[in-house]
C-alpha cells in the first residue's frame, strides 16, 4: 500500500516504514505528525484518487530529527564594477518516518 501526500508545497510517494526528508515542520523530535492532504491511496486491488484530496485518508508519521541540507552558494557580480556578493544558504528539513496509512471507507 502506498499514498501520495502533499506537504511543504511538494508531493511525496510514501509507504509504511519509509523515512523521508521534507520541509521543516514545527513539531518537536519524537512527536507524532498527521498529514491530511492525501492525494492518492493505492492498496492491493484498489486505487483511490482525490479531487484534489481524499477527505477519508490520513497518513501518520513520527518526526525523527531536524537538520539542515547541503550548503548552496550564491555569487552575484557585475563585471568591471568591483561589485561582488557571496551568500550561502542551508535549507532546514525534518526527517519523518511514516508509521501508518489510514483509509476510512
UniProtKB/Swiss-Prot annotation:
PROSITE patterns: RIBOSOMAL_L21. It comes from the Bacteria. GO terms for molecular function: rRNA binding; structural constituent of ribosome. GO terms for cellular component: cytoplasm; ribonucleoprotein complex; ribosome. Keywords: Ribonucleoprotein, Ribosomal protein, RNA-binding, rRNA-binding. InterPro entries: bL21-like, bL21-like_sf, Ribosomal_bL21, Ribosomal_bL21_CS. GO terms for biological process: translation. Part of the 50S ribosomal subunit. Contacts protein L20. NCBIfam families: L21. Belongs to the bacterial ribosomal protein bL21 family. This protein binds to 23S rRNA in the presence of protein L20. PANTHER family: 50S RIBOSOMAL PROTEIN L21, LARGE RIBOSOMAL SUBUNIT PROTEIN BL21M. This is Large ribosomal subunit protein bL21. It comes from Natranaerobius thermophilus (strain ATCC BAA-1301 / DSM 18059 / JW/NM-WN-LF).
